[in-house]
C-alpha cells in the first residue's frame, strides 16, 4: 500500500513526472476510434444484474470504501433456446420496464433505496427500487473504464511507469489503490486487474493516461461510449469514481453498462476473477496479490441457484455502498 513517504516533496521526481505526462499528451491520438462490434450467436440465458446503493443512514467510514449489502437474492429462470443477433443491431438494446415489473420498494429484505434487476435476454427491467433515479456510481465507474480501455488497447502504450505526483494525490484523497509504487512499471493486463479487483484508483488513472493522455480526455471517451450505447442519464468526469456532482448514472443504466461489459471475453474474465497476482517488478519481486472486493465479501454467502459471473463494488460518502453484478441461474 501507500505509505507516508509520499508526503516528502520530491521536486526532481515531480518535474520528471510532468515531463512524462507532457510527452504522453503529445502522443495522444487525434480522436478516439470506435471499435466495431462483432456480434455473434449467443446462448440465451436470463441474466440478473443487481445494483445496490446504500442509503445515507447506512453509510460506512472511508475505510470501508467497497463495502456493500449482500442480502439481495435474484430468483429467475433459464432458457435453453439460442438466438442469432444480426450485425446490424446496435451494440446495446436500451432496456425497458417489464409489463410485470416488480416494485421492490416495500421489500424489507432489501436495505438499499435503489436497485435494478435486468433480464438481458429480453432487455427488460424485471424488478427494482427507484430504478431510474439519479445515483452516484462511485467505483462502479471502473466498469466503464474497463470497457473504454479494452476497446482502445491496441492504440495504447503497453506499460506505464508510476510517478510520485499521481500516487501522492490519490494518497491524500484516501482513494482505494492496488498498491503500485513510484517508479514501478506495470503492463496493461496487470493494470486491468488492479483496476477491478482491489478497485485501484492508481490503475484507473494510469490506464486513462495511457489511453487518452489525461483523466479529462479519457472521460470524453467514456461519454462518447455512453452515447454510442444509447445511454440517456449517465455522465462521467473521471475514470476512478471519486465523487463529482457531474458523474452520475441510474441503476437501470448501470445494469446496462454491466451487460455490455460482459459481452467481451477479456472484460468478463477480469470482472469474474476472485484473486490475481501481478507480474514481478523491482518494487514487488513477488508481485502483488490482488483480491476482488466483491467476491471476498460474497464468499460463503452465495445466493442459492445463482452463479455470480462478475461484478464491481463501490463506495464514497456521497454514493454510499454500491454494487453492480452479473449472474446466471445455475439450476
Language-model segments: residues:
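Active-site-adjacent loops and short helices of periplasmic peptidoglycan-processing enzymes
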Residues: 71-77, 85-252, 261-265, 329
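N-terminal Lys/Arg-rich, disordered targeting/topogenic segments
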Residues: 1-35
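A sequence/structural signal for flexible, mid-protein segments enriched
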Residues: 34-37, 89-91
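Hydrophobic membrane-insertion alpha-helices, especially the h-region
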Residues: 38-52
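Sec-dependent signal peptide cleavage junction
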Residues: 51-69
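Domain-terminus/edge residues, biased toward the C-terminal soluble/receptor-binding domains
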Residues: 231-232, 243-248, 252-331
Amino acid at each position: 500500500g501507500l505509505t507516508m513517504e509520499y508526503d516528502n516533496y520530491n521536486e526532481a521526481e515531480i518535474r520528471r513526472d510532468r515531463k512524462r505526462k507532457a510527452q504522453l499528451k503529445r502522443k495522444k491520438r487525434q480522436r478516439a476510434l470506435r471499435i466495431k462490434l462483432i456480434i455473434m450467436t449467443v446462448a440465451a440465458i436470463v441474466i440478473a444484474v443487481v445494483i445496490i446503493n446504500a442509503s445515507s443512514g447506512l453509510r460506512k467510514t472511508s475505510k470501508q470504501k467497497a463495502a456493500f449489502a449482500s442480502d439481495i437474492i435474484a430468483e429467475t429462470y433459464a432458457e435453453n433456446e439460442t438466438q442469432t443477433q444480426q450485425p446490424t443491431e446496435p451494440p446495446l438494446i436500451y432496456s425497458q420496464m417489464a409489463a410485470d415489473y416488480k416494485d421492490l420498494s416495500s421489500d424489507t429484505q432489501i436495505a438499499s433505496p435503489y436497485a435494478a434487476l435486468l433480464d438481458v435476454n429480453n432487455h427488460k427491467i424485471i424488478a427494482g427500487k427507484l430504478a431510474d433515479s439519479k445515483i452516484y456510481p462511485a467505483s462502479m465507474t471502473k466498469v466503464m473504464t474497463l470497457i473504454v480501455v479494452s476497446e482502445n488497447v491496441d492504440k495504447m502504450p503497453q506499460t506505464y511507469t508510476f510517478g510520485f505526483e499521481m500516487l501522492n494525490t490519490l494518497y491524500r484523497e484516501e482513494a482505494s489503490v492496488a498498491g503500485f509504487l513510484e517508479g514501478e512499471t506495470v503492463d496493461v493486463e496487470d493494470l486491468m486487474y488492479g483496476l477491478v479487483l482491489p478497485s485501484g484508483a492508481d490503475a484507473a488513472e494510469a490506464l486513462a493516461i495511457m489511453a487518452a493522455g489525461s483523466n479529462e480526455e479519457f472521460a470524453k471517451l467514456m461519454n462518447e461510449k455512453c452515447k454510442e450505447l444509447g445511454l440517456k442519464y449517465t455522465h462521467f468526469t473521471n475514470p476512478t469514481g471519486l465523487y463529482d456532482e457531474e458523474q452520475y448514472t441510474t441503476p437501470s443504466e448501470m445494469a446496462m453498462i454491466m451487460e455490455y461489459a460482459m459481452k467481451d471475453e477479456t472484460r468478463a474474465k477480469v470482472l469474474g476473477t476472485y484473486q490475481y497476482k501481478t507480474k514481478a517488478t523491482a518494487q514487488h519481486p513477488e508481485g502483488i496479490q490482488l483480491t476482488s472486493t466483491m467476491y471476498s465479501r460474497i464468499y460463503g454467502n452465495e445466493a442459492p441457484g445463482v452463479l455470480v459471473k462478475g461484478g464491481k463494488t463501490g463506495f464514497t460518502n456521497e454514493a454510499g455502498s454500491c454494487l453492480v453484478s452479473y449472474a446466471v441461474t445455475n439450476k
